[in-house]
Every structure is written in C-alpha cells, then in structure tokens.
Amino acid sequence: DSVASRGLGDVYKRQGFMKYLTIFVFSISAFLSATDYKYQPEPNKAEYYIGKFNSGKDMDALVSWGEMFVDWSAENNWRQSTTTVIMSTYFDDSISESDYVWLNIIPNAKEQYTSLETWLEVGTDMLSTLPVTNERVIDTIQWPISSPANTDSDNGIVRFSDCKMNEGVTARDMFDAYKEFDAKAKSMGDNLGRKMIFPFAGAGTIDYDFVYSLYGSSMEDFGFAVDNYGENLALSDEAMKMNSMVECGNSRVLTTNRIQRGEL
C-alpha cells in the first residue's frame, strides 16, 4: 500500500519524454470515456514545492511564514478553496536531500493558473520573506481514491511510492483496482486516504507511471492500517488483484501539518 522529499519522483527519479507525454495524455483522455470502467476519477491539481531552509531558518520559521501566508491569502481572497500542507521527511533513504515539502491542492487547473497569475502580480512582497529556497517545484494531476473519515486533525502522516504498471494495465484499470481494495480495507476498519499522482511538469525524466499516496489523519490510524493489511488484507482477492497489476517501490514516509483547509 502507498512524492515528496527527493523531487516528486526520485519525487525524484527519471524517464523519456514520450512516456511522460503518454502519462499526461491518458490523465486527460481518461475523463472523456468511462466505458468498461466501474469508477470515474474526479481529478484535482497539486503543487509540490521541495527545498532547503535558508541559513539560520528551520521548520518553525516555515510554519510561521505559512501562517502569515494563510492570513495574506484570506485578506486577498486568494485560493480559498486550496488545501495547504507542510510535510517533513521521516523515513527516507536520502533524508538530507530536502528539508520540507510544501503541498498545495487546488480543485482544477483553471483556478490553479488564474491564481498563479494573481500571485505573480501581488504576491512578490510575501514571496520575498520566504525562509526557504525551493529546489524543485512539481505540478501534478491527482486522482483521489478515498479520504480518511476523520478529517478534524491537522497533523498526520503520508507514504509515497513510485509505481509502474505491468504490461497492458491502464491507469483506469489501476484506479478501479484501488477503489475495490479501498472498499475492502474500509470494511475491515481501515481509515486511510489513497490517491494516484501523475507528475505533469517539474519532475524531470521519470521511470515510473504514477506515485501512490497512502495517508492518515493520525499516526494511530496509519499504524493500525499497516498491521491490518498484513493480518487481514494481504491475501484478499482485492489485494492480490491490485498487486498483480503494478510494481511499487522507493517508498518514503513524511509527517504532515495542514495549515489551510480548502473551502470547497
């Protein structure tokens, strides 16, 4: 079961332009026809900002800046439907490569790019006070599979994994399989959210098809789900079908701090 601190794909590894273009094409064209598929993705957009603290700055400085950023956004009526999360790497094979991941989740591309234009016009003073240096900015299309039932907590945990589909498997096939597994997991007490993430720009050349995100609103829920998978779900028909369609690896775990909840 499960982008963030090494660039969405290495975030953070790399492959050719044609495959990258193919991912984009199926991400868009998949919405045009639901024939032969049980579930319909409802995509959103997400921006992943990854980098290092400026000299003398730390996570507290970034969180403080984030709180000012949320106030600025409200005063300027900017991206009020956007959810913003600050993440910090916990388990990773290259933990020193980045200090943070800043995530913006936006409902659609029109709102994303319209608001970016506004940010470039009126947000420069705010940007000049940023206590970090972004080393990679990744634009993605996301297919949410599910969300945790309890969303009151602003603190949580997420695991990202790079996934490559087996021959003949499409993204829509994978989405249906994940939906079926998620329903099975929920019936066994699981309370995690899941999504498929397709890097669109900024990830470089990649050697995977998508990034799988598994996230919880609490450490307890996440730990329960890990145990529950091994004890009750790993040999289920839904899990075996899902795992037969895809190979996932390069997993990394980050803690999450939601500083703005989108008003959808």
List PLM regions with ranges.
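Single conserved hydrophobic/aromatic residue that forms the stacking wall/gate
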Residues: D1-Q15
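Hydrophobic h-region of N-terminal signal peptides that target proteins for export
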Residues: I23-A34
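N-terminal hydrophobic targeting signals that begin at the initiator methionine
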Residues: M18-K19
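Short S/T/G/P-rich N-terminal loop/turn motif that feeds into the first structured element of a domain
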Residues: S33-L264
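Intrinsically disordered, low-complexity serine/threonine-rich segments
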Residues: S5-L8, A30-L32, L254
